[in-house]
Amino acid sequence: MTPPFCWYYPPLQEGILCRRYQRFFAEIELTSGDRVTAHCPNTGPMTGICQVGAPVQVSYHADPKRKLAYTWEMIFVDGTWVGVNTSLPNRVIASALAAGILPELAGYGTQQREVAYGQERSRIDFYLTDHPQEPPAYVEVKNTTWAQGGLALFPDTVTSRGQKHLRELQRLRQTQPETRVCMLYFINRGDCDRFAPGDSADPTYGQLLRAAYNQGVEILPYRFAIEPRGIQFLGTAKLLL
């Protein structure tokens, strides 16, 4: 049975990646032969997926207020489409939560976004309430694109912000043991069925993730298939710690 789509892209245009530069820009040659500058909505290193000459898909926006009309949405590497637009995962998760298709998080009647929590008043991506049986849940979302042979890895570089989030989630778990605290990894490619911390990129993050898990923070590595039509939820990846 083919998994249902939980997100649909607008009409996309195909091209090839000529280069990515200054983090926010990508030069794309469309199939029409036109070369355009597209916004790159991913400020990270894009380890393993930023391959010159690879097929890409871009969206077009005719808004005169935009500096760039095109946005780079995905790239085809290692036989699979990989999502590039880091603004999408939270929107996809919101849609999937509303549809009740995420097994560990199904059944919550209310979702709130960017809710302040903890001593530092950081903002959690989702705060879920009104479940008939489960306690409220705090859910932080991380976009994951780095992979090695079917193993999804996060992070792909040192992330002090990510380390901070894990420390805050551990404190949240300690101070509010009556609630659920979840770290959700959005695996933005359909060819991975396992997930592990990217220890070679950021060993401190890996140590913190294992410590958080041991303290009761739930680790939810969710698999998604990306294609030009839309995004499908494939289930939960095997967690390797």
Curated annotation (Swiss-Prot):
Signal peptide: none
Pfam family, one: SfsA_N
GO molecular function: DNA binding
Database matches in InterPro entries: SfsA, SfsA_C, SfsA_N
Family stated for the protein in its record: Belongs to the SfsA family.
Entry protein name: Sugar fermentation stimulation protein homolog
